[in-house]
């Protein structure tokens, strides 16, 4: 009996964790932490690191859970998401709402009391931008949902910067612009090979409303824009030669994927492009951090 109770508790924990979309949240937290380190010449305080990381992670997880609550009917008709706890009936809407509220409230309280009020307010605005403006208003209404809603997804390094310094610096906005330009080709690559599922769900993603060829062209165009934007930190003196080389190589590879996708489409290639985009962003920010501590003048 005790063994069954333990197994049941473990299963329930897994169900709640599934609401948090931990793989997505991990990239959010990673870019936020990089923002903390880039904001100061040496190291941010350990208090800033642990409290900022935990607080931002909790609020990001709350936003993910709220997204699952709002989109449970959509998730039920998509192969990629139908195994989530809400479509399967493993959790109720009330349980999910309470869970999201506890996570979000705890994260905001931690940020306000241990980090600084600015970070708390920016994180709250990011939550509203994703969970309400993007999920509720933009996603079901316009094929430009990703472009407009990408502003909330681009905020994590700004949150990290604010956590470390208590201010919004123009260099933090460069990090914002990089993720903002990265978001459309990242999500449109996913939407291309999931276009039939999005169509069944009634979501106006770009491949559904404007067609495959149009979307492939815009993936390519945004990879070109992303390369240009990613070089801005070099132009402003924020980053040096090490970052320059890394940004050019990573960006050129992303453009290569975009060009290949534009010329001849396959679901497999779109899937590889999507996966590369995740690796690209993580690697770009890691190289920027390395350049920060081991600068080589351009």
Curated annotation (Swiss-Prot):
GO terms for cellular component: plasma membrane. It is a multi-pass membrane protein. Converts heme B (protoheme IX) to heme O by substitution of the vinyl group on carbon 2 of heme B porphyrin ring with a hydroxyethyl farnesyl side group. The chain crosses the membrane at residues 24-44, 46-66, 97-117, 118-138, 146-166, 172-192, 231-251, 278-298. Signal peptide: none annotated. Belongs to the UbiA prenyltransferase family. Protoheme IX farnesyltransferase subfamily. This is Protoheme IX farnesyltransferase. Keywords: Cell inner membrane, Cell membrane, Heme biosynthesis, Membrane, Transferase, Transmembrane, Transmembrane helix. PROSITE patterns: UBIA (PS00943). Carbon 2 of the heme B porphyrin ring is defined according to the Fischer nomenclature. Its EC number is 2.5.1.141. It comes from Thiobacillus denitrificans (strain ATCC 25259 / T1). One of its GO terms (molecular function) is protoheme IX farnesyltransferase activity.
């Amino acid at each position: 009996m005790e063994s069954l109770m333990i197994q049941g508790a473990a299963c329930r924990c897994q169900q709640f964790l599934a609401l948090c979309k931990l793989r997505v949240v991990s990239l959010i937290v990673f870019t936020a932490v990089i923002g903390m380190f880039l904001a100061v010449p040496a190291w941010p305080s350990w208090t800033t690191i642990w409290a900022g990381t935990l607080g931002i992670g909790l609020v990001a997880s709350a936003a993910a859970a709220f997204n699952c609550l709002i989109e449970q009917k959509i998730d039920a008709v998509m192969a990629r998401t139908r195994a989530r706890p809400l479509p399967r009936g493993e959790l109720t809407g009330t349980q999910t709402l309470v869970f999201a509220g506890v996570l979000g409230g705890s994260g905001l309280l931690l940020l306000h009391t241990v980090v600084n009020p600015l970070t708390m307010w920016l994180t709250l605005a990011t939550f509203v931008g994703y969970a309400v403006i993007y999920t509720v208003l933009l996603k079901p209404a316009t094929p430009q949902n990703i472009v407009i809603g990408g502003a909330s997804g681009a905020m994590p390094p700004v949150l990290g910067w604010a956590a470390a310094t208590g201010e919004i610096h123009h260099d933090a906005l460069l990090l914002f612009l990089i993720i903002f330009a990265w978001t459309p080709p990242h999500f449109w690559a996913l939407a291309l090979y999931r276009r039939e599922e999005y169509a069944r769900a009634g979501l106006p993603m770009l491949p559904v409303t404007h067609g495959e060829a149009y979307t492939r062209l815009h993936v390519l165009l945004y990879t070109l824009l992303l390369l240009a934007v990613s070089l801005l930190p070099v132009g402003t003196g924020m980053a040096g030669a090490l970052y320059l080389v890394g940004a050019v190589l990573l960006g050129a590879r992303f453009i290569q994927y975009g060009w290949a996708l534009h010329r001849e489409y396959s679901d497999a290639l779109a899937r590889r492009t999507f996966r590369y985009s995740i690796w690209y962003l993580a690697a770009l920010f890691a190289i920027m951090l390395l350049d920060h501590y081991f600068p080589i003048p351009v």
